[in-house]
UniProtKB/Swiss-Prot annotation:
It catalyses: L-methionine + ATP + H2O = S-adenosyl-L-methionine + phosphate + diphosphate. Pfam families: AdoMet_Synthase. Keywords: ATP-binding, Magnesium, Nucleotide-binding, One-carbon metabolism, Transferase. ATP binds at G140, R141, G142, S143, V144, D145. GO terms for biological process: one-carbon metabolic process; S-adenosylmethionine biosynthetic process. Coiled coil: none annotated. Its cofactor is Mg(2+). Catalyzes the formation of S-adenosylmethionine from methionine and ATP. It comes from the Archaea. This is S-adenosylmethionine synthase. InterPro entries: AdoMet_synthase_2_family, AdoMet_synthase_3, S-AdoMet_synthetase_arc.
Length: 406
């Protein structure tokens, strides 16, 4: 049976043509992003263990991660963590597997602890996963009959939920600028040049006509600045980096950058952290409260509210459909001549094959506001079918970490 793919003209103005556009990104060290990353790290490690030990990825969803902020006392030139950050991983995990030789237990606890601590160790320079963080877990336990799974296995996994996936292409100028601003501040090159720049960077972009204002919350590592003047110099260099980036991404816009607008330097009120993240002192986080699958929060665009991070990469459509919707939109924009803007939505039905959505809704804005032609519709339908035919390939990409969901 043919898939239900509906292609229509998008009746609204381009985002770039709106008077006002708003875009946000919560960076690597933001508490919400830490939760997304921890959830995804655990899912990947569980998937790898299941594959290596049992030959297939078993059921798990660890998309409920909570971070409770600690307490710290940063000061110019130093500081200390007084109360560690607490990270709780929760969800559902297959903990026992019945095989031909009996029941085998899965070392879920060590896998979870190792995944989260390794992620912190690999991505933070001043946050010690042993000294500054307590990692805990509370997971619903389940068992599975491996023989029965292989005997009943369908070629295409069945959706384990009824969900919506949403994606769009291309990114607007503001979206690209916000995304790349956080990335450049958290790049290896910037950390070597400006080691005082912490990992907790949040970027809020506001475009009003041809004017863009970037408000950047940038944690500064207290041990790397010995005075207020050192701190201000770091801010100035970071601003220069961002303005240089903006001159390449948004050359036709007047761009202003405001970093740490809550600072009162004359009173030594500065955004200082011991570890590089605000999570050290009372800023809490949770999975799904931050960036969408494309790495951005875009209130001017249709968005899914699913927390993709930590969901299993085999049949949880809350994860897979959001990834696929963005991929489908990007391909349509790139390959179909005359397409200016694309919005894709996928709707699943629980228990149905994931390559057979209940509906695929594609809205396209053609150049010049023209109606979408019959030829363009056929091309778009062919791309949508091709992406869905290869949907199971996204599982491996997610497990390898080739695709990020935050």
């Amino acid at each position: 049976m043919a898939r239900r793919i509906v292609v229509e003209s998008y009746p609204y103005p381009r985002v770039e043509d709106l008077q006002v556009e708003l875009v946000e990104r919560k960076g690597l060290g933001h508490p919400d992003t830490i939760c997304d990353a921890a959830a995804e790290a655990v899912s990947r490690e569980l998937s790898k263990y299941y594959l290596e030990r049992f030959g297939k990825i078993l059921h798990h969803n660890v998309d409920k991660v909570l971070l409770v902020g600690g307490q710290a006392a940063p000061r110019l030139g130093g500081g200390e963590v007084l109360q560690p950050i607490y990270i709780l991983v929760s969800g559902r995990v297959t903990t026992e597997v019945r095989t031909g030789g009996g029941v085998e237990s899965v070392p879920v606890g060590p896998i979870i602890l190792r995944a989260v601590k390794n992620y912190i160790r690999e991505n933070f320079r001043f946050l010690d996963p042993e000294e500054h963080v307590i990692v805990d877990y509370r997971v619903g336990r389940g068992s599975v009959d491996l023989v029965g799974i292989f005997e009943a296995e369908d070629k295409v996994p069945l959706a384990n939920d009824t969900s919506i996936g949403s994606g769009h292409a291309p990114l607007s100028t503001l979206e690209r600028l916000v995304l790349e601003t956080e990335r450049i501040l958290n790049s290896r090159e910037t950390k070597e040049r400006l080691p005082a720049v912490g990992e907790d960077v949040k970027v809020m972009g506001v475009r009003d006509g041809k004017s863009i204002t970037l408000t950047v919350a940038m944690a500064v590592v207290s041990s790397q600045v010995g005075s207020v003047s050192d701190y201000l110099a770091v801010k100035e260099e970071a601003e220069s980096l961002i303005l240089d980036l903006a001159s390449r991404i948004a050359p036709d816009y007047d761009v202003r950058v405001n970093i740490n607008t809550g600072d009162i330097p004359e009173k030594k009120i500065l955004y200082l952290t011991v570890t590089g993240t605000s999570a050290e002192h009372g800023d809490d986080g949770a999975t799904g409260r931050g960036n969408r699958v494309n790495g951005l929060i875009t209130p001017m665009r249709p968005m899914s509210m699913e927390a993709a991070a930590g969901k299993n990469p085999v049949n949880h459509v809350g994860k897979i459909y959001n990834v696929v919707a963005n991929e489908m939109a990007a391909l349509i924009h790139r390959e179909v001549k005359g397409v200016e803007e694309v919005y894709v939505k996928l709707v699943s039905q629980i228990g149905k094959p994931i390559d057979r959505p209940r509906i695929v809704d594609v809205k396209v804005r053609m150049e010049g506001g023209r109606e979408v032609t019959a030829d363009a519709k056929r091309e778009i339908e062919a791309i949508a079918n091709s992406v869905l035919d290869g949907i199971t390939g996204y599982t491996e990409k997610l497990v390898r970490g080739d695709i990020t969901v935050y």
